[in-house]
């Protein structure tokens, strides 16, 4: 919690049993109040690993709803738990949880209502296991979108986001 604002990290999971523990253990619980994991009908033991880590809010989809459906479940549960700040963190460790402090304080201090982080800077995506073809495709799409929209973002399609409940 920062300035009496409840912070919830949501983990949209699919076959994340091998990387979930590493991701979870780096979440800064000095400010994070709760964690929600939504298992999108994984074929591995993602839910069991989440349970063994002590994650209190585990939702398992009976059928795979895809990334968008998983996100909706994550955000709806966080709002149901009265989150003031919701941070989406993928449990595949392509995003470092170490940015949660900065993202949270940026919103808690009222600077922005939305913070979008990048896994591309510093080659974090490749170090985190992103396949090279996906990395190249992501870079190409981002370059194209930057040119079309006259922007300078490092990654348009990031899944590492923080939102104020206002948005």
Locations of regions flagged by a protein language model:
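A short, conserved beta-strand element in the Rossmann-like catalytic core
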Residues: 41, 66, 94
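Donor nucleotide-sugar binding loop of glycosyltransferases
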Residues: 16-19, 42, 96
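Acceptor/aglycone-binding surface of glycosyltransferases and processive sugar-polymer synthases
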Residues: 61-63, 67-80, 97-167
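A conserved acidic beta->alpha catalytic loop
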Residues: 39-47
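Short beta-strand-to-loop acidic/aromatic patch adjacent to the donor-nucleotide binding site
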Residues: 83-94
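Short, well-formed alpha-helical segments that are part of the catalytic scaffolds
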Residues: 14-29
